[in-house]
Amino acid sequence: MSKELELQLQEALRRIERLEAAQACRNLMGKYSYYHTAFRNKEYVELWANRDDCYYRFPFGEYRGIEAIRHCYLVEHGDRTDPGMDQRLKGMLMMHEMDTEVLEVAEDGQTAKGCWISPGHETVPAKDLKDGEEPHGDANWCWGKYEVEFIKDNGQWKIWHMILYPLFKTSFY
């Protein structure tokens, strides 16, 4: 094989690796959206790199390090399999789709950055309904922008840093 052909082959392989990396990052965000909607927070936490320099920043706080992120989702929010959660989640639906993606993988193939617009809605049932009271609750449009950095962690793509910027939240009605 000629030197020129060998260089072209190496470049093609690097490009394929970066394309595969981009798809892996897209899949992480798809899983994030799905797990969030399904309240599958135990699985959601597995999407994160097992690192002390991870962070998750959103309107309700900032969590630094994988242990803090685990605490956010497994203690503060809980998981659908937790005792009593089936009753707490009854009538609740939070769906945040990922849209308008911009995603770039670094030349070295070890990190990537992306952002997504997230058109979402959140429906929360009213608490403490009185006997005979018609079920009701809050339904809101809740749009945001996700800024996410990914890192290859032990050979697997994982979420490294995530920031959620709220764009607007308003009543569905």
Predicted segment positions?
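Transmembrane beta-barrel outer-membrane domains
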Residues: 23, 93-94, 139-141
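A short, polar/proline- and glycine-enriched secondary-structure boundary/capping micro-motif
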Residues: 123-128, 169-173
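Short, low-complexity N-terminal intrinsically disordered segments enriched in polar/charged residues
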Residues: 1-34, 38-42, 46-47
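A structural signal for alpha-helical segments
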Residues: 20, 61-64, 138
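Short, hydrophobic/aromatic alpha-helical segments in well-folded domains
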Residues: 28-31, 43, 99, 145-149
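A solvent-exposed, acidic/Ser-Thr-rich amphipathic alpha-helical stretch
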Residues: 41-123
